[in-house]
Amino acid sequence: MKQILLSLLCLLSFTATAQEARDKNILAALRHGWNFELRAGLSMGGTAPIPMPREIRGVEKYNPKLNVHVEGQASKWFDPHWGLVMGLRMEQKGMVTGARVKNYHTSLLLGEGAEVSGNWTGYVESNYAASSIVLPISAAYKVNDHGKLQAGLYAGYRFDGSFTGHVTDGHFRMGSPVGERVDFPADKQATYDFSGELSRFEAGMQVGGSWRAYRHFLVYGELRASFTPIFPGSFATLTTKLYPIYVCTGFSYHF
């Protein structure tokens, strides 16, 4: 029993010492112009075709999914207003869209899994998902004790992702717009899977702001837009370039 009590006392003493050391480190960092934040929030958006191709005749379905992100930030303030914000973020991106298209170039899995390229006219549905680790860096401007604006760049690495879908209620021209026609009524569909073609790297810009609601708690909003499409330039199956564009919001804890 004595050994258990002694062990508990040692553990409590160690915890208190570690807490005190952490508090001292944070105070020392604050004295040198450093701030720290832990963020968590949701993102809503999708992969937008830029420019909008004439083959897309209308969007009939859109599901932004539940995209979660968490981020740690360190801010270095050089004067009362200007600073530099660096971070490390884990994020999810995704969406489901359905559209009516005409002569849309793609590849479909026909027959016993054979992939055939051609042009599709009818309904097409796409399901995109990606998980990435991101390094953002931004310039920050402190408006007052409550508000902060920031804008900058980010680079990300996708470690998991998929891009799948199906077509139905239309017809497929094999090889070219005048190739052999294969009809797909509303009760029949063909699938596609381009997951293995997704780019690993992403770079883009972000702009947003935060507001201190309480002493340690803030709310924030941010627009993130990628400069790079989700497929590399060598991927010729889809002639349209798709760029991730997301609006993000959430809460953060300010140390």
Region locations from a protein language model:
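Extracellular/periplasm-exposed beta-strand and loop segments of Gram-negative cell-envelope proteins
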Residues: G46-K65, K93-A130, R158-E202, Q206, ...
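Repeated loop/turn-to-beta-strand initiation elements of outer-membrane beta-barrel proteins
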Residues: H81-L84, H146-L149, R215-G221
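Hydrophobic, lipid-facing positions within transmembrane beta-strands of outer-membrane proteins
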Residues: W34-F36, L66-G72, S131-I137, A203-V207, ...
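Short glycine/proline- and aromatic-enriched beta-strand/turn motifs that initiate or cap beta-hairpins
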Residues: Q19-S75, G156, S226, H254
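Outer-membrane beta-barrel "beta-signal"
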Residues: W211-F217, Y243-F255
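Transmembrane beta-barrel strands of outer-membrane/channel proteins
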Residues: L38-M44, M86-Q92, A151-Y157, M205, ...
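Bacterial Sec-dependent N-terminal signal peptides
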Residues: M1-D23, R39, G147, F251-F255
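Outer-membrane beta-barrel strand-turn architecture
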Residues: K76-P80, Y141-D145, A213-R215, F255
